[in-house]
Amino acid sequence: MNRTEGKWIADLGDGTYKNPILYADYPDPDVIRVGDDFYMTASTFTYVPGLPILHSKDMVNWELINYAVKKLPDRYNVPVHGCGVWAPAIRYNDGKFYIYYGDPDIGIFMTCTDDIYGEWSDLVLVKEGKGLIDTCPIWDDDGKAYIV
């Protein structure tokens, strides 16, 4: 194991890396590139804060920089199979960061921010419906948003 001060280090220091890149539980990761920076988020089930935001310059060395959701709704206080933030999608469009995710019992939620290191908006239910997971937001050339 490549460890430094008890911390897992995937970067071998010679231009190569060792798997796993992240020695942690970040299920269903989604990554975007904004300029020279990469940002990642992952599913959150009963753990808070929720929707972790990680940053990297090389997709090997990642740092946890924020959480998009500081408190999940009360229904997440007790573990329930299928309950939680499923496969979030992080996107950057027109100067804003967005995260969309599906809760299979309720529908698709969204949160956004102008500053990925700052506060994120309250969660907004954008599409009600059961079984909606694995969202993929896109914007067309006219700026209209779609969820695929």
What are the language-model segments listed below?
Residues 1-148:
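Carbohydrate-active catalytic/glycan-binding domains of CAZyme proteins
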